Amino acid sequence: RMALARSAEQSIDARYYIWQRDSTGLSLLKELKAAADRGVRVRLLVDDNGTPDLDAELAALNTLANFEVRVFNPFSLRSPRLLSYPLDFPRINRRMHNKSFTVDGVATIVGGRNIGDIYFARDTEVQYSDFDVLATGAVVDDVAADFDAYWNSASAYPHELLVTPPTDLSALDAASAEAEADPDTAAYAQSVSDSRLVQGILGHTLALDWVPVTLLSDDPRKALADAPAGTLVATALAPLVGQARQSIDVISAYFVPGREGTERLAFAARQGLRVRVLTNSLEATDVLPV
């Protein structure tokens, strides 16, 4: 993501459910600011449930000429936000879990990984092994259109409507200094820069697998319980299971197929299809009821 941000010439569109205020999160915000400072249009869409400690930094970024921040389905109370749940639970319980990072309309990263130390092996005690994909080609246009749908939805609020814009950027400067002061930051950054993936991106030698891809995404109106019938991912996945001819592979941290989903997958297996499901063990999950 940093390599793509540094190479951006026209635009960066980023949206995430969780963006943590830690070394990884602050470092990537710094890269987005640097891109905006050199004239790149930056749009950042975050879910309000996953950014509880970033109001000051996001408010500062939102004042920059080329930087715009919007918040999806914001809480009624800024602090503590959890108090909003009993006041407006039906709405507040509908969150935006979409994650994408699109640069110049030519490359995008999509998948399950949020932004934070625990998602990038930066935390020494906890690691979330989420899966994402770097993509180029026609699917980037689909991701861009989906981003625009969420960005322009009735549930996406300009950050300045929620938090009073700051008169200076001291909070942002302090956050950047905090990230740089971490003694392990330089070594971690170097190890990432030396990785085969980043070197392939920077050297334009990264080998891509060219395959047909279809993007499925919920209609953003689901946050208002107003999504038209047939516009949710769960609805779109059901017929795909029936159309499979050889195999079905599922990767999900929270695998809850329900009765209908279980029956569809079991039927496919009985018909001779190879069905593989990769999910958390009981020891690894962070949501025990799942």
Regions found by a protein language model. Give the residues of each.
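Charged, low-complexity intrinsically disordered terminal segments
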Residues: 1-99, 103-290
